[in-house]
Amino acid sequence: MTAPHTLGQASPADREGPVLRLDGLGWSVGGATIVEDVSLSVREGEFLAFIGPNGAGKTSLFNLISGLSLPTAGRIELDGAEMTDRPAHVRARRGAGRTFQTSSLWPAMTVADHVRLAAQAARGGSYRLWRRADPYTAEVAGVLERTGLGHRARATAGELSHGEKRKLELAVLLVGEPRLMLLDEPMAGVSAEEVPALTELIRTLHREEGRTVLMVEHHMDVLLGLADRLAVMHHGRLLALGTPEAVTADPVVQQAYLGEGL
């Protein structure tokens, strides 16, 4: 078993009690190993970013953490509770929330109704979007203001720009008040003009609201301004883990990603 190349200052996760702990996590399908022997801990309030080329296993690892896939090896703990074989909805109740590379929004539904539906699901309410008495109005308005979408409440998802859609996905996620946010390529499809505002929103959720964030992203300039640590995935394994400065300057990482732009 080969440990990842650890760089920079070590995380104090083990001392403080991690929000997330992975121990020897692996996932194989049809004889092919997709994720192999990944071990790490994430402390509360930390921002850990995952980088690596397409096919490195980053999204597959997120699927294992969120419960969309179940590992074939290893162990997962969320906030001290074992979640290795638990389904996604149990992990969500434990505080793990997830966004995806591909949007799952309904084009004809309004921005406000997306958030309202999420609030009803999170609070155990019935799915009656158009009833006269709506106990979620204040909550919906508050979440939309936090994510910069208050002025777009009545617009449909299909009318939004890519950046606004990513903000709406974050708004839907925030309704559940997740302690651990897994963001899978939130900048995908977002225009260069919209990247700074979306980056600032994610920074606010992390630093001002104190949320723990795991993020997969290919925009290195974005990650270098957000992440406390970088995790480098390579052929399904955790190649390196450390501060952004140490990881991007490391010869092992540079050799593995020669031509990948690191």
Please annotate each region the language model reported.
Residues L70, E82-T102, Y127-T137, P244-P251:
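ABC ATPase NBD coupling module
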Residues S66:
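Helix-to-loop junction immediately C-terminal to a conserved catalytic motif
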Residues T84-D85, V143-E159, E164:
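Conserved ABC nucleotide-binding domain
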Residues I51-P53:
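The feature captures the beta-strand-to-loop junction immediately N-terminal to the Walker
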Residues R128-R152, E200-T204, T212:
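Conserved ABC ATPase "signature" region
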Residues M181-E185:
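Catalytic Walker B motif of ABC-type/P-loop ATPase nucleotide-binding domains
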